[in-house]
Amino acid sequence: METVVDHHVIEVDEFDALFIEVKTEAAPVESVVSVAPIPARFPAKLHARKIAAELNASDGLVFLPGEPSRSYEDSDMGPAFRQRRYFYYLSGANFADCAVTYELASDRLILWVPYVEPRQVLWFGSTPGISECLKQFDVDDVRYTTQLNKFLYRHLTPGSTLYVIHADQVPLHGDFLQSAAEVRIDVTSLQPAMDQARVVKTDYEVAMIRKAAAVSALAHRRVAEKLLRLENESEIEAVYQAWCTTSGAREQAYAIIAGSGKNASTLHYDANNEPLEGREVVVFDAGCEWHCYASDITRTLPISGKFSAEAKAVYDVVAKMQDECISFIRPGTLFFDLHIHASRVAQQGLLKLGVLKGDPAEVWDAGTVAAFFPHGLGHHVGLEVHDVSGRERLLLLNNVMGAQGGRVGKREVVTPEMLGAMVQASAPGAAAAAAPPPYKGRQYLRKNMIVTVEPGIYFCREYIEGYFLSNPRHARFINKTVLERYYRVGGVRIEDDILVTDDGYENLSTGAPKGEELLRVINGKA
């Protein structure tokens, strides 16, 4: 159980104080995860009404196509099927070539499914029929997609509004384009409305994520139990994947990360093919899906069964970062501030270890701690592992890698400049920080949000030398001699999925051991 902190102001060290914005004084609650029975029907109609409330429109037609059947270019083979998440949110149907419509005025939700001919069953099997879909999904009607165009002709009359996520999803074909010339096509309102609806989970969604986290946590435990007998990163991945698959969770929410040694310093390392021998720790980041809902858990394991002095010191700092931040989770907490708190704890720890040096206030003002804690503290979890955040940002950060055309990961980069801007925006009396469109500002936590808390400290030689040791502003605060001892550790990250409850939080991933329990499991003493 993490320490409960009930103060608005927490003294971090002798040079500053952290202001945590909280709108309630209730104490957080952590409970042991128990997986309740999975609800029988997907609450599509409840989701539709949440979307309608966010659209704030009394009329119009929402149209969402599902993922079509696909083949690779010049091939008769195709990728593994992955349903479009916005479509799934409004339907619950996890098979190809479907669509869903929602009539705002009549509150009528219709799922459109493909008709499966007998010869298709021979080759590919069948998909749920109309009667089965009505049992599985809370929709008003289920019809075949062969009837969809006729439905659209009848409902898209001059002056009506069609809501779609993307312009290329407008269901206009042939001469229908001319007849729909007076239909208003809205491609800007639906996605923000759906994002806002998705950010606070329904009870069904919480149950799905709870189940995904429970399966993933037990798979993490299985890896820890077998660790001393494993020789390669690939074996860690295999043990984990096998447990998930046999537990009914074949799909992973993201590429499994099993980075040992130097690879532990790469945030999205996923080659998972190097030997473990001679290395100190492995950062193991993996979370399965359950009915399309994600989980996201990270543990850092000592490969020999015992942490080295350097690895233990770093692990303790990261554990402190996580424990203290989780203890603040409750409705009304400004997540923005938790990242700043984690950064302060990281700096304090690195100064104590001697990796950082100098006047603490000057080190903080420079933002040099971002060399070692270079990503956001966490993100929403839902139908995407890095789920939508609604009209407000959890951390108010641009996706810098994506903006520059690079590979996009599930963590947001935090530079010294970004950290400084966050600190300035969080100062008492400061106005709400500006956010990039279409977001409005900083996000306070609400009941039934699910967020990760995933602090980490990394020693990536290329990153530190390329951007910090080469810059006099930061180099003067880094002790290169001490730092050299820590490169061998690679990195440490600890991550859990946290549900915001009425008056606190519930850690959904406690089944994955960490800390002293992790050491006992690895060494067969649990």
From Swiss-Prot:
User: What domain of life?
Assistant: Eukaryota
* Physiological role: Catalyzes the removal of a penultimate prolyl residue from the N-termini of peptides.
UniProt remark on cofactor binding: Binds 2 manganese ions per subunit.
Any GO MF annotation of the entry: manganese ion binding
Gene3D superfamilies per record: Creatinase/methionine aminopeptidase superfamily (3.90.230.10), Creatinase/prolidase N-terminal domain (3.40.350.10)
Protein family membership: Belongs to the peptidase M24B family.
Which keywords, in A-to-Z order, does the entry hold? Aminopeptidase, Hydrolase, Manganese, Metal-binding, Metalloprotease, Protease
Disulfide bonding pattern of the chain: none
Q: Which Pfam families match?
A: AMP_N, Peptidase_M24
| KW Ligase (keyword) present | no
Q: What is its EC number?
A: 3.4.11.9
Q: What class of enzyme is it?
A: hydrolase
Tell me its cofactors: Mn(2+)
Listed under catalytic activity are: Release of any N-terminal amino acid, including proline, that is linked to proline, even from a dipeptide or tripeptide
Q: Which residues bind Mn(2+) 2?
A: 285, 296, 495
Q: What is this protein called?
A: Probable Xaa-Pro aminopeptidase GLRG_02280
Q: Does the keyword Manganese apply?
A: yes
The UniProt record gives the binding positions of Mn(2+) 1 as 296, 454, 495
Q: Share an example GO biological-process annotation for this protein.
A: proteolysis
